[in-house]
A protein has these predicted regions:
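Acidic, divalent-metal-binding catalytic cores of TOPRIM
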Residues: 2, 7-9, 22-24, 28-184
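H-loop/switch region of ABC-family ATPase nucleotide-binding domains
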Residues: 15-17
Length: 184
């Protein structure tokens, strides 16, 4: 796969349900050329720049950090993006205690290893209709701090401030779940 991706005059089509294979294929380019097409709800979603809200820096980041575990997001019916190991371990346990089996519902908890969740969330953000039906939740603490001068703000104001710092409003299928404290 790596060798074929280096060839400019070669086109190949491969269908898979394997995050192992998906992690080896470049997500797309910062052009309309596509390497990955994601199928969901009777629609096909190209990953090229003309279709997603991925930016050039996102493609570069994801080509480096989209490994086998994280590539599972392409096959999930729902995705929970978390910052670290603690959340990756605790969220399925908490869900289970609430009577929800994330695996049975095909919901993937993806540990992005930092506050780099927006690189991954933009995979689900489209430039035009139809909107992707994969629900994506971002669970984060206040590492990305709102612009305040130690003033107490309402929760909605904090979320707006964080979304502003992220550089865009989030579409309906991507939800920011912001902790009230500086750490979870």
């Amino acid at each position: 796969i790596s060798a074929l991706q280096q060839e400019e005059s070669v086109q190949f089509i491969l269908t898979t349900h394997s995050p192992n294979i998906t992690s080896k294929v470049k997500l797309g380019k910062d052009t309309d050329v596509n390497s990955i097409l994601m199928c969901n709800s009777d629609n096909v979603f190209p990953m090229g720049a003309g279709y997603t809200k991925l930016e050039k820096k996102d493609y570069k980041f994801l080509d480096t950090f989209l490994d086998v575990t994280k590539s599972n997001l392409f096959f999930a019916k729902g995705v929970i993006l978390v910052e670290g190991w603690a959340e990756e371990i605790l969220i399925p346990v908490i869900a289970s205690k609430m009577g929800l089996d994330l695996t049975q519902h095909e919901i993937s908890v993806v540990n992005v290893g930092s506050t780099a969740y927006l690189h991954f969330a933009r995979v689900f953000m489209r430039r035009s209709e139809p909107e992707m039906k994969v629900k994506c939740a971002i669970v984060t603490d206040l590492d990305v701090r709102p612009d305040t001068e130690n003033k107490v703000q309402k929760e909605s104001e904090k979320k707006k401030s964080v979304e502003h710092n992220l550089g865009m409003p989030l579409p309906n299928n991507v939800k920011l779940n912001l902790a009230k404290e500086w750490t979870l």
